[in-house]
Swiss-Prot record:
It comes from Pongo pygmaeus (Bornean orangutan). The lineage of its organism: Eukaryota, Metazoa, Chordata, Craniata, Vertebrata. It holds the Pfam family Defensin_beta_2. Its main location: secreted. Disulfide bonds join 27-55, 35-49, 39-56. Residues 1-20 form the signal peptide. InterPro entries: Beta-defensin, Beta_defensin_dom. This is Beta-defensin 125. One of its GO terms (cellular component) is extracellular region. Residues 109-157 are annotated as: Disordered.
Amino acid sequence: MNLLMLTFIICGLLTQVTKGSFEPQKCWKNNIGHCRRRCLDTERYILLCRNKLSCCISIIISHEYTRRPAFPVIHLEDITFDYSDVDSFTGSPVSMLNDLITFDTTKFGETITPETNTPETTMPPSETTSSKTTMPPSETATSETMPPPSQTALTHN
């Protein structure tokens, strides 16, 4: 009787082992791919499975797998805007400025003011610096008073 029970247990385990080893392994998300040595012509390689096998996913769309639902269609006629809170916005960050007139401050000469449309002449600022520049006398630094550059980064004075 014990021998008979042992053979039933072994046969039951053998069917489980053979079922897992002879069936092609599944891979990828929701087990839609198959692990193979070479992908078929209608399949695409995605990643590597165990034992140097490739995870091959079919290029042809199969309806047996659940797919992501399509995006809902938005009709432009259904979109409405409420303009009741919008004042007369000119596009300028500061209110009541006219964006059609720009002022160039880098050029000197004749500019037109937008209010009167009359030309005005402006002159560049006069140069107040002299041609001679004097430098204060600098102290001569010796190697005894100043440490080398590698040491100056380490000292905190």
